[in-house]
Amino acid sequence: MLCLLCGYSGNILDIAARYLGVPYVAGALEGAGEEALVIDEQRLDCTTFVELTVAHWMAEQCDTLSFEGSVQGMRYRDGVVDGYLSRLHYFSDWVKENTERGVWSELTPTEADAHLWEADTLTLSFMSAHPQSYPYLKAHAWAVDSIRDIEANYRNLPIHYIKKSVLNLGPDELPIRNGDILALVTTIEGLDVTHLGFAVWKDDRLHLMHASMNHGKVVIDERTLYDYLSTRKSCPGVRVVRIRNEE
């Protein structure tokens, strides 16, 4: 269990806001070379933005946790850097591993808000089906079978997401809080999510703080999340993850 019960000193958005304006880069961790712990706070993709923010937050809560150690613990299976296959590539794998470590928990429907949610099942296969999209897999064909073995743990996985059609509701009607991690569910075969960021409530409307490809940097999107998703036909809604001490 992680030391996440130390004195609370601020919310996650305070730390996330430090990255506003930092340039966006696609695939910040992807490369064909040997795996190493990479921490680049000058260029962020959507995952490293969330990951580094949470790692800073964890380290600031407890003197026994370092920032670098927190990044490594979140990013790698069992917190050990042991090649490309030890990195938690899929959002669902990343969430499961760090839920078990006590970092966060994924929200699921309650009796009161069940009407806001959709249930589905998920089978991961995208990486093994598209190795040419990943520099390491393209250069090391032998690793594809190992990725497929990891994916096999996520066949017909039950998931719940909040429907995008209700994301225009206010903070008293949605279970989403400031600082929750929001992940955009996708209908792309074999993939779980395509993007993630933090929930930000502004004037009782939900927005996304994220490393944005369109803006080329970390922003609080000026569009509401409802409007942002209205043009994303492959996204039916969002999964919601809450950091443990933010509960």
Q: What residue spans do the PLM features occupy?
A:
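Beta-rich nucleic-acid/ligand-interaction surfaces
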Residues: 70-74, 168-174
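Acidic/His-rich structured neighborhood in mature extracellular/periplasmic domains
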Residues: 24-159, 201, 209-213
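Short alpha-helix capping/helix-loop boundary micro-motifs
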Residues: 160-172, 186
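Extracytoplasmic/periplasmic, Sec-exported soluble proteins
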Residues: 8-12, 38-46, 63, 174, ...
